Regions:
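C-terminal amphipathic alpha-helical interaction region
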Residues: 198-199, 203-267
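C-terminal substrate-binding/catalytic lobe of Rossmann-fold NAD(P)-dependent dehydrogenases
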Residues: 1-213, 217-218
C-alpha cells in the first residue's frame, strides 16, 4: 500500500523500514526488509527488489501449519492468507492476462495525507502482528491440549528471541503475557496487548478500508482484522450456516434456549 497508493520508491521505503526497526516493530524481518530496499543492482543501477520476479516459492512449512491447524480446529486466518498469497503470486501468467481485463479502481488515487497513511500502516502492522501471534500461540495451546505436549508458551516465545527468523522485540511482550497468566487462552485477552491493539484500531481499520477502496490486496492486514472482529463477537452468523447444514444434510444443531441436539424440517 505504501508503494502503490503513495508511489514510494525503494530508497524511501528503505528509510521508512529502517526507522520502524528502531521502535516497537524492531525485528529481524523488518531489518532485512530495509536492507533489501537499499540494495542496488550492479548491472542496471536499479533497486534489485524491483527486478525480482513476483512469484513467491515455498518449502511447505506454511502449508503444513495450515493443514495442522485445520486438523485440530485452530483458526489461523493470517497464516492461511500468507500461504494463499504465495500461491496466487505463482499464477503469474494468469495474472498478467487478467490485469487488462478485470476492472478496478485507480490504485494511485489516494488523496489523503501521505505521512498520516505511513504512520497508520505502521500501527496497522503492529496490531496485525499481535493478531497473527495470537492466532499462532492459540494454535500451539490447542495442539498442546490435543496431543498432551504440555507446552510452555512463554518459554517458546523466549526461545524464538534468538537464532530465529521471527525474532523480534515484541516476543518479550508475549513472554511477559504468559508470565502474568500462564493459562492465557489468547494473547488478545492479555491486558497490555489488548490495550496495544485497541489503541491502534482506528489506524488499522483506516488502512484496510483505504486498501479496499483502492483495490490493493492486503490479505495479511484484512485477515488479522477479521480474526480480531470475529474473536470479539459474542454472536456470529454461524447459526445460519448450521441451519443450512441441518436443512440439506440433517447435520443437526444446538439451540440457545435449551440443551440437546436437534433436527428440524425447514420446509
Amino acid at each position: 500500500i505504501l508503494q502503490r497508493a503513495l508511489g514510494l520508491k525503494a530508497h524511501e521505503l528503505a528509510a521508512i523500514f529502517t526507522e520502524w526497526n528502531q521502535g516497537e516493530l524492531d525485528s529481524y524481518l523488518i531489518e532485512i526488509t530495509a536492507k533489501i530496499f537499499q540494495r542496488i543492482d550492479d548491472e542496471t543501477g536499479q533497486p534489485l527488489v524491483n527486478l525480482v520476479l513476483d512469484k513467491a516459492a515455498q518449502k511447505g512449512t506454511g502449508k503444513w501449519t495450515s493443514q495442522d491447524a485445520f486438523d485440530i480446529g485452530a483458526p489461523i486466518p493470517t497464516i492461511n492468507s500468507a500461504v494463499v498469497g504465495r500461491i496466487v503470486s505463482s499464477l503469474k501468467t494468469e495474472r498478467v492476462a487478467a490485469a487488462p481485463i478485470l476492472p478496478g479502481p485507480d490504485r494511485s488515487g489516494y488523496e489523503g495525507d501521505r505521512n498520516q497513511l505511513i504512520e497508520a500502516v505502521r500501527q496497522a502492522l503492529y496490531a496485525s502482528k499481535i493478531s497473527a501471534y495470537a492466532q499462532g500461540m492459540s494454535m500451539l495451546r490447542m495442539a498442546s491440549d490435543e496431543y498432551d505436549y504440555d507446552l510452555n508458551l512463554g518459554e517458546i516465545a523466549a526461545i524464538w528471541r534468538a537464532g530465529c527468523i521471527i525474532r523480534a522485540r515484541f516476543l518479550n511482550r508475549i513472554t511477559d503475557a504468559y508470565v502474568r497468566k500462564p493459562d492465557l487462552a489468547n494473547l488478545l485477552l492479555d491486558e497490555e496487548l489488548g490495550k496495544a491493539v485497541s489503541e491502534r484500531l482506528p489506524a488499522w481499520r483506516h488502512v484496510v478500508q483505504t486498501a479496499v477502496g483502492l483495490g490493493i490486496p492486503v490479505p495479511g492486514f484484512s485477515a488479522s482484522l477479521a480474526y480480531y472482529d470475529s474473536y470479539r463477537s459474542e454472536r456470529l452468523p454461524a447459526n445460519l450456516i448450521q441451519a443450512q447444514r441441518d436443512f440439506f444434510g440433517a447435520h443437526t444443531y444446538e439451540r440457545t434456549d435449551r440443551d440437546g441436539v436437534y433436527h428440524s424440517s425447514w420446509e
